[in-house]
A protein has these predicted regions:
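Periplasmic-binding protein-like
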Residues: 33-43, 123-150, 154, 158, ...
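Solvent-exposed, polar/charged alpha-helical surfaces in well-ordered, non-transmembrane soluble domains
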Residues: 19, 57, 74-78, 102, ...
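Soluble non-cytosolic domains of exported or imported proteins
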Residues: 12, 66-71, 98, 113, ...
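Flexible, active-site-proximal loop/turn residues at the rims of small-molecule/cofactor binding pockets
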Residues: 17, 118, 150, 178
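Short, glycine-/small- and polar/acidic-enriched structural segments
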Residues: 1-86, 91-94, 110-116, 129-133, ...
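Short polybasic/polar patches that bind polyanions
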Residues: 81, 123, 187-188
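Secondary-structure end/capping motifs
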Residues: 152-190
Length: 190
């Protein structure tokens, strides 16, 4: 995402992306935006991992599809560590979350890590949630960031985007109906 920072002004990105952007792309962090509790690990219902998710032996040698260098990789490696395993025990295939879900539903891979509304799509397609950041008790903080050019030349628009983001999140938290509507709108547009 940071590699494409010339094509955007403001973004919501996980902590690894923020650090990468600040270090390598002159991106400025505006603030924390959420703790993505819906960052989850899924498998197929008929898999050995679904039948015995805490057995380290069923995880050895599997292929997990996820975007590498992200909070999803952090979450997956934390789960493996809880089983006494590491990245050396599995194959990780790098893929963005939406195409990853499509590929997984088409039979690719043995496990899938996705976040936000894509996690709802995974559940809707019958996949089994093995764990998530909340269950693992880990932090998965995301932040809002902007390019230096946008901060200098479009500060009014950055301020407006920042306010709309937080007001929308506040609205989402007001009721389950609001959150369901937000998820539906997100899935339709992404």
């Amino acid at each position: 995402m940071m590699e494409a920072s010339a094509s955007w002004d403001i973004c919501d990105v996980g902590a690894p992306g923020i650090l990468n952007g600040m270090k390598n792309y002159d991106i400025q962090m505006l603030g924390l935006c959420d703790n993505e509790y819906n960052t989850a690990l899924f498998v197929r219902p008929d898999s050995p991992q679904a039948a015995d998710p805490t057995n380290p032996e069923v995880w050895k040698g599997i292929e997990c599809i996820l975007p590498t260098g992200t909070t999803l990789q952090y979450m997956f490696l934390s789960y493996l560590q809880s089983l006494g395993l590491s990245a050396d025990d599995v194959t990780i295939t790098n893929m963005d979350v939406t195409p990853a879900l499509t590929a997984f539903n088409a039979g690719e891979g043995d496990a899938l890590c996705v976040w936000n509304a894509v996690a709802y799509n995974a559940e809707d397609s019958g996949l089994v949630r093995i764990t998530d950041v909340s269950e693992l008790g880990i932090n998965n903080v995301c932040g809002l960031a902007a390019t230096k050019d946008a901060m200098e030349n479009k500060s009014d628009l950055i301020d407006l985007a920042w306010m709309v983001y937080y007001l929308t999140w506040d609205w989402c938290q007001q009721s389950e109906d609001n959150m369901a509507q937000a998820v539906e709108l997100y899935v339709e547009s992404c």
